[in-house]
């Protein structure tokens, strides 16, 4: 029985990402490349991930780090949006990739940029949503139960003491 593709595209692996894994030239869109790279992470295909980086990224020099990221327990991919770039040889894919580590589930959110060169799509770089600073658990309480000491950091996030800021 054929297994479903790790990229979540509702096709079998053989009908989906295996085609790209066997021949990079068969990748027709940035989204297809992004999905095949995610599947390569799930399946441990370090060589595929390295060769689908744009040559300017010198991915071979970062092979060890790439192999470590592939070694994560990847569990789900959500494509948020795929869009064209400023020209036909550029595209963007925004996605969330979920993985488990030390009994916790994490999400990698990225807007990846892909470029097409000599007929091949490559991953070149990505941007990440601004990392939210870890919120103080007291901020999840209702206002009536929030107790802030005068010498505690201000809840507005200014970095000042509460008594010198909002207190």
UniProtKB/Swiss-Prot annotation:
SUPFAM superfamilies: NTF2-like (SSF54427), Sec-C motif (SSF103642)
One Pfam family cited in the UniProt record for this chain: SEC-C
Family the UniProt entry places it in: Belongs to the UPF0225 family.
Name of the protein this chain belongs to: UPF0225 protein VP1145
Organism from which the protein derives: Vibrio parahaemolyticus serotype O3:K6 (strain RIMD 2210633)
